[in-house]
Amino acid sequence: MPCQPLRTHLVSEFLIVGGGVIGMMTTLQLADAGHSVTLLERGQCGREASWAGGGIVSPLYPWRYSAPISRLSTWSEGYYPELALRLLEETGIDPEYRQKGLLYLRVDDEPRAMAWAREVGKPLERVDADFLYDKEPEAVAGLADALWMPTLGSIRNPRLVSALRARLAAMPSVTLREECEVTGFESAAGRVLAVNTTAGPVAGGQVIVCGGAWASGLLERLEVRLPVRPVKGQMILFKTPPGLVRRVVLMDGRYVIPRADGRVLAGSTLEECGFDKTATPDARESLWESAVKIIPALAECEVEHHWAGLRPGSPDGVPFIGAVPGFDNLHVNAGHYRNGLVLAPASTRLLVDQLLGREPILDTAPYRLSEALASTA
């Protein structure tokens, strides 16, 4: 239902625009630290890219990413087991974090992968066919070897965002405003005074834009040009016998992910088509073909669902995290591209460290907005 008109000009210490996994984790950390937070979401919390993704808690091929992304993903990877357990205990909703490892099939840059693993201390190893088919009996036949990362896990996105929302809704210092679309900003002398919404103006001491694919459009209203664009990704879900697929398997840039209820998710596409979220027959066929190439037995299984989401694309996939130049109280955390859920724990912690004046967990320089904004001027 539409957001009800605000009776007062709400004021919180922190005002967050965008209720995806980035916005909700930021809210959780600020509230945990004893601060009041208002979270504005144009629809329902966690129902855009955060809901639509696959939930692999790693970049698909981590050795192909730049150091700034690797640093965020490495920090985040160890956070999810603890977060999932906390949310289950506090909300009764199991985000279904499962650490069963990941198999990489037909990797064409294996030397680079192994060199990366040695450099960062990851337990990536080359395994033979016996090992591969013992771990994944239904994998495509005829493979001589694979790469195996035993520490990687996955989480079920819809359950994660549901648990985060439930936890925030129970926190007295948090105000959730859903179906509450931002229509503009009031600003003066380099300070955001209020955020105008369909329910009226809302004020906060510090304003944080976590708008995902919509972040650029929001900031344009303040004449800030952030190079973030929507990139569509489509996925399908198979209804399968329990145990058909045992763990995440990745081949030729596509993947299959088993769920606890026996279903198998297959993804994903990369499409530059603006804000169009239409799920298309061509993408469905392409995803089906890729999934069947990985696990041939999926050809006999029903495709139960097919959907699309919009990723926040950015140059090189490195997110923008930190203060917006020219404003005293405006910050952003956006542009995570394919790795929003992967990078969320570290990127939100990095921003919260800056907001609260703490020693940051990582060097903030690679994520600052100043260079990006200068290049678009």
Report residues per predicted region.
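Dinucleotide-binding Rossmann-like beta1-alpha1 core, especially the glycine-rich loop
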Residues: 56-135, 290-292
